[in-house]
Amino acid sequence: MKNTIKIFSAIIYMAAILISSLSFGQMKQESKKTNSAVSASTLKTNMRKLWEDHVIWTRNVILCLVDELPGTDQSVKRLLQNQVDIGNAFKPYYGEEMGKKLTELLYVHINTSAEVVKAAKAGNTAAFDEANKRWYANSDEMSEFLCKANSNWVLADMKMMMEDHLKITTDEANQRIKKDYDADILAFDKINNEILVMADVFSEGIVKQFPEKFKTGGTKLASK
C-alpha cells in the first residue's frame, strides 16, 4: 500500500514536469485544437462529461487504494489525463497559462486526496488531519483562482461547492474503508449529482462572461 501511494505521487510529479516542459510550439498547436468552435449546449455537455469523468476515475482510484486492486497505475494515469482535459477545456476562454495552472491545482487536489485516503485507511488521525487541512487549502486556492477569472462565479458559493465535493469524497472513501457498500454507493450517487451541478456552474459562467461567442441553439462560436 505504501509503495502504491509513492508510485501514485511519482506519476503525478512526472506528469506535472512533462506538462510544464511543453514547448511554445506545442502549446500553440494544442491551442488550435482546444479553440475549436462549439455551441453553448455542446460546452455544457462537454463540461459535464469532463467533470463526471473526474468523479468516476477518482472513485476508481479510491477503490484501487482501499481494496489494493491491480491496475492502480493505469487508473491513476487516466485520472491524471482528466485533469489535463479539464484544463484544456478552459483554455479557449482564458488562455494557455490559466488552463495549465488549473491542471496543476487539480493535480494537487488528486495527490492530496490520495494522502487523505491512505491516512483514513491506516487509521492515522494525525496524518489524516494534516493532509485534510492541505486538501481544503488547495480547494480554497482553486476557488479563488477560478473566481478571479470570471466574476460570474461568486467566491463564497464556489468555496462551499468545492468543500461539499471534498466532504462527499471523504464520505465515499470512508464508507468503502468500513465496507459499508450500500453507503459507499449512495455517496457516489451523491457526488455524481453534485459534480453535474458544478459543471453547469462552470459552463453557464463561461457563456455569461463571453456572450458574443455563444448563441442559443446550435449556432457555433463566433470566429476570432
Question: Residues of each region from the PLM?
Answer:
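Bacterial N-terminal signal peptides
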Residues: A10-S21
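Mid-length scaffold segments of soluble, non-membrane domains
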Residues: E96-E130, W135
